[in-house]
Each structure stands twice: as C-alpha cells, then as structure tokens.
Amino acid sequence: MNATRFESIVETLLPSLLAGDRSAVRTLVSRALGSGISAEDFTEQVAWPIHEALHKLHRHDQIERISFNYATRLLRQVVDQMQLAYSRAERNGKCVTLFCGSGENEDLGGQMAADLLEAAGFAVQFAGGGVASDEILEETSRRRPDFLVLFASSASDAPGIRSVIDRVREVGATPDMEIAVGGGVFNRADGLAEAVGATRNARTPLDLVRTLQAPSATARQTPPKARPARLRAVA
C-alpha cells in the first residue's frame, strides 16, 4: 500500500481521536484493517505518525489538554488491539531492557517499540519512564541484556540519558551490552544520539526492530568516552 493511502488514514483517524469518538475510531480502524493493512504496518504507518503529531500539536499548544488526553488514550487502545494481531517470530535469543520518557505519550511510543520487538523474537522488559538512573544501572547489571533501549524520550530526558550511558560505560559491568536510542527528542535533534554516546539509533518502532536485528558491525556507532560536553536545548 502506498504512502498516500496511509496518510489518508491518518488524516481521517486523527480528528476522531481528538474528539474522543470511540465508535468512529473503532469503525475507521476496522475498515483500514479490512482493506488488507497488516497490524504491523498500521502501527508503523498510522499509529506512530499520529503519536508524533499529537506530541507536536500539544507541545505547540495547538490542541487542548482534553483533546490530547482523549486521543492518547484512544490511540493506546488501538495499539493494544494491533499487538494482538502481530505475526510472532521464534525467539532470537536476544534480550532488550527498554525505558522511555515519563509522559503518557512517550510511554505509548515505548509500548509500540516493545510490542514490535517482542513480536520479532526479542525477550523484552519494558519499564516505561520515570525510573531513576541508579535503578536502570542496577537492572542492567542484574539482567545483562543485549540491548539497553531508551526510546521516545522527551527533551528534558536528554541530560539524564547521557548520565545513564556515561555511568554504564564507567562501571563496565555490562561491556557487551549495546545502547540504542530513538524516537522522541532523538528525531528532532540531529546528532543527539551520537552526543549521548548511543551505539544504535532508530527513528520509528519498526526501524528499531531492524536496527537491533542488524549485525553489530553494521549498526554500531563508535561510542564516545564520557565527557563534560553540554547538550544543546531541544524543544
């Protein structure tokens, strides 16, 4: 299905989400799936762009808080519905521990990534946002995942992410663990992934799946050593 078709679905669905029209949303989603769109494509090409649009509209005060809440909660229901229909791959032996920004919109973005990673065969622990850096460090030291993923983070999370990555490098308890970032502020600030020291970067949930599936030599960036450089502010 071409991009124009997905854009049309987004443009039709978004007003119903903002209005909190649950019946209309169910009808539109069912119609889209009935036209042959896979659940994975719906999440990547419809739910994710709407998620990003909601963040932008809310950040620039172009929608009221009540509309943002309506849309975010209804979109989560849609995402929950989609993940039940994902094709499931066999386990690939790789573990992911995933965190995201603390807002509900960021949490929804993290959920999309977690759901698609799990469907692709990764073992996923998704803790959401608001977790202290000490707890993240302890959890990764205990679980020793193949990947620590910090996805769909807000601008205010960037210094904390840098701190977490620097501490992981300094402690050295998980030398083989790669750190991936993406979505959220990392889509709005060129070079931020490199600045915080991430080894992999992805723009969307499905892009994250492909990035983590790629061989290390293909996807890895050279992680910089801990340094006091200041991160520029990002909206």
Question: Residue spans of the language-model regions?
Answer:
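Conserved hydrophobic helix-helix packing surfaces used for dimerization/oligomerization
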Residues: 96-97
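Long amphipathic alpha-helical segments
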Residues: 1-90
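Active-site-adjacent loop and "lid" segments of alpha/beta metabolic enzymes
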Residues: 100-108
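Residue-level detector of anion-binding/catalytic polar loops
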Residues: 38, 123, 146, 199
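Short helix-loop-beta junction
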Residues: 111-125
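Peripheral docking tails and interdomain loops at the edges
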Residues: 184-235
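Cofactor-cradling patches in redox/metallo enzymes
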Residues: 118, 131-190
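A short glycine-rich beta-strand->turn/loop micro-motif centered on a GG-aromatic cluster
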Residues: 123-133
